[in-house]
Swiss-Prot record:
The lineage of its organism: Eukaryota, Viridiplantae, Streptophyta, Embryophyta, Tracheophyta. It holds the Pfam family Kelch_FKB95. Residues 5-51 form the F-box domain. Keywords: Kelch repeat, Repeat. It comes from Arabidopsis thaliana (Mouse-ear cress). Kelch repeats lie at residues 187-236, 238-285, 287-324. The keyword Metal-binding does not apply. Gene3D superfamilies: Kelch-type beta propeller (2.120.10.80). This is Putative F-box/kelch-repeat protein At4g11750.
Length: 386
């Protein structure tokens, strides 16, 4: 039996907003369950302006999932329990409903304090399509890769403060082949990939300040390759990887051949990230690694013996740079339980460079954040600043 709602004296919105601005964004999904008024306040842009003035902006994690091939992708965000009790009472009041749909059997390595909860979106209606995304500030920018079997020039972004969807001007030219997107110096680069890309229309970039598109010159025939499989923003430059490796230098507006400062092999963007100008990656060895640009080789990230064993299948893993740390997220089947379910694990790892060739990781937390049907697909994992 649910407890009756508690009658609180009326508190002016201005005072509530100033109080809420001092609370971590991780607790906002819980606070939004208090009442319609609280739900409106935690989604108001005024609250985030106060947070900005107070210097209380923070990074937040978002996860994009598809529950079946026909369904629309759904967004989840990381939430933290308002209690450190090892046995929280799920019948204890207004916050219980946030956890009941996603409860799971607790394992030894999980503190069970963090979980992913659905994002309440007011106008986020997207027909089934493959999505690619990039983040900048409080926004997640989304490109529709396929629409009715064709590539699309439609560009959208989700404002993660109010969780509303907005449209930005379309690209000047629609890409003919699969593409990648990267953000560099306040501009979003859309890069055509795969075999034999159209070099006359290889890259367009969107200026977030002026809200306009502009063409980026292509690499010359002497240095460009026949296919592009990956891209990376590193040290203020845009790198393209394929049968040849080239780098675009925006300040000089020119292309060069990549030297030995970059790894010879490159991994997909979803299992690689850059933190404090160091490249981190996850590969077939099933461990986290970092690239030493001075030695020009990959080294193991040390100190992670307590991290649960990660999947052999790299498509079940996501890697993300997050406030000077690395966050790793992965899928794992429910052992000895329901064969139709799987768990989403997430770990936040602090980094410490102890010497020129040694970086240690420290696990700050590691939790099962969600339990899902096995048919659910892991799409995107992103971090925004709000």
């Amino acid at each position: 039996m649910m407890n009756p709602p508690v009658d609180l004296p009326y508190i002016p919105d201005d005072l509530l907003l100033n109080c809420l601005a001092r609370v971590s964004r991780l607790y906002y999904p819980i606070l939004s369950l208090v009442s319609k008024r609280f739900r409106s306040l935690v989604a108001s842009l005024e609250l985030y302006e106060i947070r900005k003035l107070l210097g209380h902006r923070e990074k937040c994690l978002y996860l994009n999932l598809r529950f079946s091939s026909e369904s629309e992708p759904r967004w989840f965000t990381l939430c933290r329990r308002p209690t450190r009790s090892p046995n929280p009472n799920f019948n204890s009041g207004w916050f219980a409903s946030c956890f009941i749909p996603h409860t799971m059997k607790k394992e030894k390595k999980s503190s069970d304090n963090n979980l992913m909860v659905p994002v309440p979106t007011s106008n986020f209606i997207t027909p089934p399509s493959e999505l690619t995304r990039i983040t900048n500030g409080s926004n997640i920018y989304i490109v529709r890769v396929f629409t009715n079997g064709a590539f699309s020039s439609r560009f959208l972004f989700m404002d993660c403060r109010s969780h509303t969807l907005h449209e930005v001007p379309r690209m000047d030219k629609t890409k003919k082949k699969p593409f990648m997107i990267r953000v560099l110096d306040g501009k979003i680069y859309v890069i055509e990939g795969c075999k034999n890309p159209d070099y006359s229309n290889l890259i367009e970039r969107f200026d977030l300040k002026t809200q306009t598109w502009e063409h980026v010159p292509s690499p010359s025939a002497e240095i460009r390759g026949s296919y592009i499989t990956g891209s990376l923003v590193y040290d203020g430059k845009l790198y393209l990887f394929g049968d040849k490796r080239v780098v675009y230098k925006p300040k000089e507006n020119k292309w060069d051949v990549v030297g030995l400062e970059m790894p010879l092999r490159w991994t997909p963007s979803y299992i690689s990230c850059v933190v404090d100008n160091v490249i981190y990656s996850y590969g077939r060895s099933r461990v986290l690694m970092w690239y030493n640009t001075e030695e020009r080789l990959w080294r193991y990230l040390k100190g992670l013996k307590k991290l649960p064993k990660l999947p052999k299948d790299c498509t079940c893993v996501r890697l993300l740079g997050y406030s000077g740390k690395v966050v790793v997220l992965w899928e794992k089947n429910v052992g000895g339980g329901d064969p139709q379910k799987k768990m989403i694990w997430c770990a936040e790892i602090a980094l410490e460079r102890r010497s020129a060739n040694k970086i240690y990781g420290k696990i700050e937390w590691c939790d099962v954040v969600l339990t899902l049907p096995r048919s659910c697909s892991l799409l995107n994992f992103a971090a925004v600043t709000v």
